[in-house]
UniProtKB/Swiss-Prot annotation:
This is Putative receptor-like protein 16. It comes from Arabidopsis thaliana (Mouse-ear cress). SUPFAM superfamilies: L domain-like. Signal peptide: none annotated. It comes from the Eukaryota.
Length: 302
């Protein structure tokens, strides 16, 4: 059932729980508000896809267990949910995609997420979460997209990680992460790594195991030293942003044929397009304290 983008208002009707055979329900982009009815969480046990995005739903997210044992995709982003991430989500063992981003969720990221072994995509960006990123998230065998940007997460990035599981997209921008970037952070499958606007320090690591990285965003940290020449060997890279760090030295000559992509069309505002479609083909190098050299098409902006 698709009821998206209508003018529905008021609370979600408790009668939703009577639709025991429904498998797909999308009521996004309406004006429903209030909390999820308990009858709804206990009914609808055939649901496979549930989309409740862009509404005004509030209170806690799944504070208790539901009967959504078959659900594969759950989208509850862009609401007004508050409190901790509910333990009711822990029972959704079939989940492949969970999006609870753009809410007012607080507390820490639960360690039990690693029990959702079929989870491919976990999006919790733009909330009020704090504490460290659980190391268990990086060891999940199926997780390919992990989005934790724009929270108040702190602490060091995990060091003792081997390969970072199946991760392809890791988004951690706009947090309070500190320490050095581990050499092991970029597993062999990583395509997008976004660590912008944290408090990371030390040198840019060599990223020895990287094969497929397309987008590497390290802007707005406290990185020092020079650009590692090993980046020259990463031929798949499309976008590199090292702006607003404390780098020095010269730009490797291997970048002489790169063209500047930073700022064209406002890439920061449209980064979701890059991540989704990988359409950008420009290498962005924009930072201070580097030798301003003429190298083919490469432009350096302060």
């Amino acid at each position: 059932m698709n009821l998206t983008t209508n003018g529905f208002q008021r609370n979600l009707p408790s009668s939703l729980g009577n639709m025991e055979m429904i498998e797909f329900l999308d009521i996004s982009h309406n004006s429903f508000h209030g909390k999820l009815p308990r009858s709804f969480l206990k009914g609808c046990d055939s649901l496979i896809v549930l989309k409740l995005s862009h509404k005004k739903l509030s209170e806690e997210v799944f504070p208790e267990a539901s009967n959504f044992f078959s659900i594969l995709e759950l989208s509850m982003d862009n609401n007004l949910f508050t409190g901790k991430i509910g333990r009711g989500l822990q029972s959704l063992r079939s989940l492949i995609m969970l999006d609870i981003s753009n809410n007012n969720l607080s507390g820490v990221i639960p360690s039990w997420f690693d029990q959702l072994q079929d989870l491919h995509s976990l999006q919790i960006s733009n909330n009020l979460l704090e504490g460290e990123v659980p190391i268990s998230l990086f060891n999940m065998s199926s997780l390919q997209l992990l989005a934790l940007s724009a929270n108040s997460l702190s602490g060091d990035l995990p060091q003792a990680i081997s390969g970072y599981g199946a991760l392809k997209v890791l988004l951690l921008r706009d947090n309070n992460l500190s320490g050095v970037i581990p050499d092991t952070l970029l597993g062999k499958n990583i395509i997008v790594l976004d660590l912008r606007n944290n408090r990371l320090s030390g040198n840019i690591p060599e990223f020895i195991n990287t094969q497929y990285i397309r987008i590497l965003l390290l802007r707005g940290n406290n990185l020092t030293g020079s650009i590692p020449r090993r980046l020259c060997a990463v031929r798949s890279i499309h976008l590199l942003d090292l702006a607003n760090n404390k780098l020095n030295g010269s730009i490797p000559s291997c970048l002489r044929n790169a063209s500047l992509g930073l700022g064209r069309g406002g890439y920061i505002r449209r980064l979701f397009i890059i991540i989704t479609f990988f359409l950008w083909e420009h290498l962005s190098v924009h930072f201070s304290n580097l030798c301003s050299c003429k190298m083919g098409l490469l432009s350096i902006m302060s």
